[in-house]
Amino acid sequence: MSYSKSTIYRRQGTEPNSHFRRTVEEKSQLSGTNEESLGGHTLSSNAFKNNSSSISPSSSAKDPREQRKRTFPLNDTHSSRARQHERPFRSRKSRRRKGKKAFSPRPGSPPSPSFYRSGSQKRARNLTTKDYFAKRSESSSSASVSPISPSANRNDSKRQASSFRRSPPSSVHMKPSAFNGRKVSRRPSSSPPPIPSIPHETTSSDTQKKSSVSSGFPENKHGKFHFHIPNERRSRFDQPPSKRMALTSTARESVPAPLPSPPSGPIYTYTYPKPAYEKIDQIGEGTYGKVYKAINTVTGDLVALKRIRLEQEKDGFPITTVREVKILQRLRHKNIVRLLEIMVEKSSVYMVFEYMDHDLTGVLLNSQLHFTPGNIKHLSKQIFEALAYLHHRGVLHRDIKGSNILLNNNGDLKFADFGLARFNTSSKSANYTNRVITLWFRPPELLLGETAYDTAVDIWSAGCIVMELFTGKPFFQGRDEISQLEVIYDMMGTPDVHSWPEVKNLPWYELLKPVEEKKSRFVETFKEILSPAAIDLCQKLLALNPFCRPSAHETLMHEYFTSESPPPEPAVILKNMQGSWHEWESKKRKSKR
């Protein structure tokens, strides 16, 4: 038994959308009178042609199922809702398809890209766009007056309600500006204008990927506004424009100015209309360089310029100067000279210090000046206060001598020249050099080759300075290391294993061991010159055994500073001295005589 193709389609439910291909006459011949359930009346098909409705009572009362069969034609496979609202046909296969439903555009709005991609265009290929929306407008107008049958589902009611939504305002196009000919639409006047920003260089990918943001409206989504931008092809690869793109009509067409070129010289350079410092006179000289008295041309303050020569340094910047700068930057004390700044020239480096009028050696070379016991006590106290601070910070000066102790006219004392200073590791395995400290102020352990020493070496040098204040001249004056040891042994006695057990372990002890033992004659020599407290203090400071020497803090607690009279008194007599007295200047004056 053979069936026609139309019959097979009807049985399988896959007949093409033939409703839109047949004319009205063919429909009436196949289905007869179109009956609509409108309160028990029938509506003839001619009523649509004459635009007038003829309502008559139903001629026969039959079974409801028979009436429904007569109401809808047998050769029409789509549902009553599809026929009533004249919407495109959806097959059973498409109904079972999962995912979002294809969007059906409402009257007055052109179809969106999703409409063309969903296949709805194929199902309505027999209709032009004008006819399609004409039928949609008729169906929507009829839906507003016709009752909704109980069989209507929620999706149908939502589609009807969506037809009454307000259409979005049309976009306002602008003239092409600085965006490579792109049409930029501005937002409606109701919304605040966006902040203009610097336009960026667009690429070919930016031109191809355009979105709804460029036209001033939100991005297309199913169930929301769908509109068409003339002369622009919308695609699913829409991307928002760059955040720096301006969306207002006030966008400037000018290209931003290029960045300025980097300067040819250093970025941070300080220049002055005149030299920052003017040299007045030379006040010192040594192996490192020269020291000048200078004036600050801006503030008028006196400073000391320590010039470091670099032309003779084959290995670069002197390590002693590096240590001095590093240590002075960490020290802040009233009895330590202050480093103001560092100035660099082509072949030299200047270290700028605060200016002090004298140094201790230059003052003691002046035969007309004599310190009182109160002045000596005040100066000695300042020496140990500075040492207590240095040792507390873990710094060994290692070059305490008269020329490195500065004085001003008010009697203030400050330590200077930290070129040989270093941080103390406080370790028994420390290995320092013993070629430090000027020979006259060098302790006996260094003269015997000790390399693991501590703060006791500075205490010995300070004891020599105190004795120099009492006597007015250096206390131990030797020609070399051997003669220096002999001078020390003559005054303080020779060391032995009982008084200094560690002396036998020193490298040069056996080599420089004295032939005969000598006893100390320090007390007998100074018992008529110094007070008992001063003798006791100096004898402890100049002990041969470094472990028997007191610390700087213990020295300040000695009765010489705490209870013995006279009390410490500032050396104001320095104000009566004419000019500045430094060691280099004092020796220069003597040579002229």
From Swiss-Prot:
Residues 139-152, 198-215 have a biased composition (Low complexity). ATP binds at I283, G284, E285, G286, T287, Y288, G289, K290, V291, K306. Gene3D superfamilies: Phosphorylase Kinase, domain 1 (3.30.200.20), Transferase(Phosphotransferase) domain 1 (1.10.510.10). Residues 90-103 have a biased composition (Basic residues). The active site is at D399 (proton acceptor). Residues 1-262 are annotated as: Disordered. The modification Phosphoserine is found at S56, S58, S104, S109. Pfam families: Pkinase (PF00069). Residues 1-17, 29-51, 160-170 have a biased composition (Polar residues). Disulfide bonds: none annotated. Its EC number is 2.7.11.23. Disruption phenotype: Cells display severe cytokinesis defects. They are able to form, but not maintain the integrity of the actomyosin ring and are unable to successfully complete division septum formation upon treatment with low doses (0.3 uM) of actin depolymerizing drug, latrunculin A (LatA). However, deletion mutants are competent to delay nuclear cycle progression after cytokinetic failure upon treatment with LatA. In addition, deletion mutants suppress the lethal, multiseptate phenotype conferred by hyperactivation of the SIN. Signal peptide: none annotated. GO terms for biological process: mRNA processing; positive regulation of transcription by RNA polymerase II; positive regulation of transcription elongation by RNA polymerase II. It is found in: Nucleus, Nucleolus. GO terms for molecular function: ATP binding; cyclin binding; cyclin-dependent protein serine/threonine kinase activity; RNA polymerase II CTD heptapeptide repeat kinase activity; RNA polymerase II CTD heptapeptide repeat S2 kinase activity. CTDK-I consists of three subunits, ctk1/lsk1, ctk2/lsc1 and ctk3 (also called alpha, beta and gamma). Interacts with ctk2/lsc1. This interaction is dependent on kinase activity. Catalytic subunit of the CTDK-I complex, which hyperphosphorylates the C-terminal heptapeptide repeat domain (CTD) of the largest RNA polymerase II subunit. Involved in RNA polymerase II transcriptional elongation and pre-mRNA 3'-end processing. Together with ctk2/lsc1, required for the regulation of cytokinesis by phosphorylating 'Ser-2' residues found in the heptad repeats of the CTD. Required for nuclear localization of ctk2/lsc1. Positively regulates the septation initiation network (SIN) and promotes successful completion of cytokinesis in response to perturbation of the actomyosin ring. This is CTD kinase subunit alpha. The lineage of its organism: Eukaryota, Fungi, Dikarya, Ascomycota, Taphrinomycotina.
